Regions:
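Bacterial Sec-dependent N-terminal signal peptides
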Residues: 1-26
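N-terminal, active-site-proximal structural segment of metallo-dependent hydrolase catalytic domains
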Residues: 19-109, 113, 117-129, 306-314, ...
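Catalytic metal-binding/acid-base residues of hydrolase active sites
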Residues: 37, 95, 182, 224-227
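Extracytoplasmic/secreted cell-surface and envelope-processing proteins
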Residues: 41, 98-101, 125-128, 185-188, ...
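Metal-dependent phosphoester/phosphodiester hydrolase catalytic core
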Residues: 47, 169-200, 204
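Second-shell loop/turn segments in exported
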Residues: 55-64, 85-91, 118-119, 150-152, ...
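Structured beta-strand-rich core segments of catalytic domains in phosphoester-bond hydrolases
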Residues: 94-182
């Protein structure tokens, strides 16, 4: 089975992916964002509500399922990244540093020698964001957790934003924000103010960076629990659709066109949408040394299953309701290929 998967993956990239010579580029730098959906370990954290994913819990979570979940995540990363693996991988819904240690040392990923940036956040369920990086492709300079404190209700806890800064092989500095905005639990409109506020905090951070250098290279990615056309992203963050001429100090959302064509990374009530997004500063669209053109959804067939209720396909999840079905996630990965040139 594993041998067949490797052969299929090889054929996919040979047939579907453009070669560097065709693009006249010297190298590619792939960035991936993936909500892996409930990647929990099996250790009880007394500070969080993780009982659902513990041995003896309501889902019957155990060590075997934990290791299988790890293998499934590894399979997705390897398939998307081909022989070199993505240079940067943003992950949502990771419970602990232990999960990251196991994942980066798993046989399917160990050869890529990933390191990770991660902080424990105050999320009630204990799920965090993290960034995996290959040290030879991304030299880490700084990392920090950007805490969120809602002024109207300080008792509400949510996930931190993860900010990481580093250098890519061209010598360019790259600022990366990994995000998982508050959920739509209780209703999209009723919870919108939380996402709007988190987006405003993020906007303050990016404005500060662009204020120091209006040609700063910024990548913002993750699961925003909102669509590109929603107020949190369009107004509070100020991320626009891609329209030339590009301004170096403006943020642009790659997922506008994907969302408006009724495609996306997540399916809800029969409709696809782009909750998972990659947003970049304008300089990354015009730079001559490190630049990108578009984002894509990785919708390989093995990540999908038949949607029996609404027809078509849907993401192949670990659980369908309470039924364990050995899938992957309720989200599909999104990614961008950056191209690098020496001048």
């Amino acid at each position: 089975m594993n041998r067949l998967f490797c052969i299929i993956t090889f054929i996919y990239f040979i047939v579907c992916e453009p070669t560097f010579s065709q693009q006249n580029q010297t190298a590619s730098f792939k960035i991936m964002s993936y909500n892996v959906e409930n990647y929990f370990d099996v250790v009880d954290d007394s500070l969080t509500n993780d009982s659902e994913y513990l041995p003896g819990g309501m889902r019957g979570w155990n060590y075997e399922k934990y290791i299988f979940k790890q293998a499934q995540i590894s399979k997705v990363i390897a398939a998307l990244g081909a022989w070199e693996g993505p240079a940067l991988i943003g992950l949502c819904e990771v419970e602990s540093e232990k999960c990251l240690k196991y994942l980066t040392n798993y046989a399917g990923l160990k050869s890529f020698k990933y390191k990770y940036a991660h902080f424990e956040s105050p999320d009630a369920r204990g799920i965090d964001v993290a960034l995996l990086y290959q040290p030879l492709a991304f030299k880490l300079i700084h990392k920090e957790a950007v805490s969120i404190h809602f002024p109207d209700n300080p008792t509400i806890k949510t996930r931190d934003l993860l900010y990481v800064m580093g250098k890519v092989p061209t010598g360019d500095t790259l600022h990366v924000f990994m995000c998982h905005f508050p959920s739509r639990l209780g209703g999209a409109l009723e919870s919108a103010h939380k996402r709007n506020y988190v987006a405003s905090v993020l906007h303050t951070k990016t404005d500060s960076i662009l204020g120091r250098n209006n040609k700063a290279n910024i990548v913002i990615m993750g699961d925003f629990n909102d669509y590109p056309t929603d107020a949190s992203l369009q107004k509070a963050l100020g991320a626009k659709r891609l329209e030339k001429p590009y301004a170096s100090n403006q943020l642009y959302n790659f997922m506008y066109s994907i969302h408006e064509s009724n495609k996306g990374s997540h399916k809800h009530d029969g409709s696809w949408g782009a909750l998972d997004q990659i947003i970049v500063s304008g300089n990354l669209l015009t730079s001559k040394t490190f630049y990108c053109h578009e984002a894509k959804v990785f919708d390989a067939e093995f990540l999908l299953e038949n949607d029996l209720k609404f027809l078509g396909k849907q993401p192949f999840r670990t659980y369908n309701g309470m039924k364990y079905q050995k899938g992957f996630s309720d989200h599909l990965p999104v990614y961008v290929d950056f191209f690098m040139k020496d001048l």
